[in-house]
Every structure is written in C-alpha cells, then in structure tokens.
From Swiss-Prot:
The keyword Transmembrane helix applies. Its cofactor is heme b. Heme binds at residue 18. Signal peptide: none annotated. It is a single-pass membrane protein. GO terms for biological process: photosynthetic electron transport chain. One of its GO terms (molecular function) is heme binding. Keywords: Chloroplast, Electron transport, Heme, Iron, Membrane, Metal-binding, Photosynthesis, Photosystem II, Plastid, Thylakoid, Transmembrane, Transmembrane helix, Transport. Heterodimer of an alpha subunit and a beta subunit. PSII is composed of 1 copy each of membrane proteins PsbA, PsbB, PsbC, PsbD, PsbE, PsbF, PsbH, PsbI, PsbJ, PsbK, PsbL, PsbM, PsbT, PsbX, PsbY, PsbZ, Psb30/Ycf12, at least 3 peripheral proteins of the oxygen-evolving complex and a large number of cofactors. It forms dimeric complexes. This is Cytochrome b559 subunit beta. InterPro entries: PSII_cyt_b559_bsu, PSII_cyt_b559_CS, PSII_cyt_b559_N.
Amino acid sequence: MTIDRTFPIFTVRWLAVHGLAVPTVSFLGSISAMQFIQR
C-alpha cells in the first residue's frame, strides 16, 4: 500500500522535472546554436 501511494508522487515529480528540464535544455541549446551560427 505504501509503495502504491508513493509511486504516483515520484512519477508526477519525475514528469514535472523532465517537463521543465527538456524545454529548458532545448531552449538553451537553440540559443547557443544561434549565437554560434552568427559568429
């Protein structure tokens, strides 16, 4: 019962972290790529 109750919290936290980290990494990567192309 305890595992079933903590697992969804871990999943939501994992999805939230990746949901925020993936767009941030891609955004920073696109900015660095644009600056590199401009040079």
